[in-house]
Amino acid sequence: MSTTFNPQVDLSWSGSARSVRRLGDNWEPLRRLYFLDFPLLLLSVGLLTWVFPTDTMLVVSSSVGAFVGFYTLWEVVVRRRPIRFAHFFCIANTAGYGFGVLNSWLTISRGDRGLAEFFNRDAEAVSRAMAAVLISSGILYALGEIYESPIFGSNFKLNFDNRAVAFIFFGTVLIIVGYLTGTMGYMGTSQDSGGHVTVLAGLLAWLFPALFAFTCLTYLAWPKNALKSAIGFALIVQFILLVPTGRRGILYFIVMALIASRFSSFRPTWSFFKKIIYAFILVIVIFVGALTFYYLRVAGWGKHKVSLVDRISLAIDLFESGNTSKANEGFEKNLQKRTFILGYLSDLLDASLRMPTAMGKNALHEFQLVIPSAFWEDKEAFLYQEESVANTQFNFAYKDEANSLYTAGAIDFGLWGMVLYPILVCALFRLLAEFLRVNLPEMVSTIAILALLYNSLVTEAGLWVHLLAVRNAILFSAFLWICFKMPALALKHPPQKGAFLR
């Protein structure tokens, strides 16, 4: 395709020379697959599903969404194609909702019942919710490919030095301190008695995904020596510390590590057989980590406020007893049912078609949630969740559901909110990433942007979670800047260009 016509928005501050653009400047031309083919496919299947909302069309639309989402992810991870926030949000929603439905449909024994009926949902409402996901994603795919310039140029490679290693070790120690002080534990970071998240808890929750990806990247780029082994050990420690935070976190962290590996000079030349072996090992690692987390969950059943140390002890006792059939069966059933996260969204969208919507009240409340407590003395009075807004607006009785950008949009503006909210948050992320790119050193801006990319890849992240990621990126980038402000020490064996230069 000719590159003479390229309407992408160039988000560069005035005065920045194109030849020295931070994070690379070699961009691929527009790809028809993403500004035309995929959008048309998603829009056409979505419209058909909306007009014919049956259980069969639910499976068809979910399959199409899962295929498009995973293909986009494969292109980013394996083929190292351009990274855009728009496409990451599309991956999160098409693969998250689509594969979730497809997995439950394939694995649950339902007899003659449809999937929606099995989950006590209306088939038409569930089908139309999946249709809305495809329609919204189709629009975002096209807008992202046309108007959002890639964050990283295809020629971008990070320059590593002693400061990168110091940051890895310091960050790993910080995570350990978080566990020792109770700031982190089972299911991630904890809150104080007033429901507030401490500064350390907020820092660790924001930093951990990017730290893990950056550690993997540094390990691949570092030459073979004792320090490389130390980096590898830190990576193993981080993975062990990751397991108690949740199964989805394990998957997302590893995906982000694979994406970050593109920023080094490391290029695997493995045979096809070796690639299969390594992929199989990776799947085993994810499975073992997820199963370990589930054992930690089972160990706490029937008990009140079980500490992480007690959970680990009880989980070990459970495993050594050999009486794990109930836990394994529960793990299997959980994998079958937990992925069906479309039900809550379908209820909200269906209600929004019949009843007045919140008209932005939910968005305003979720914005209030991310205001630091230091600036709002009685903030705890407003610490209710999205479900409370939905319950008040639509007369539901939800307690804890799968929040997302789509559910926030459906509460406020119905279908139009599902289309609009991802676009607005994507634009906000891209503007912030550009600000970080221009004003911070490459190493610091890359880590901060990796944290934003991680957030955009998570399906079950409500509007306030995305706004929190923006707030934390602004606040905690100063912490990263300080970490990398220390002087760089000369390396004993100067590396080749593209591995470490500073």
Where are these regions (language model features)?
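Aromatic-rich transmembrane-lumenal/periplasmic boundary elements in polytopic membrane proteins
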Residues: I277-E380
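Long extracytoplasmic/lumenal interhelical loops at the membrane interface
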Residues: M187-S190, V197, L353-W416
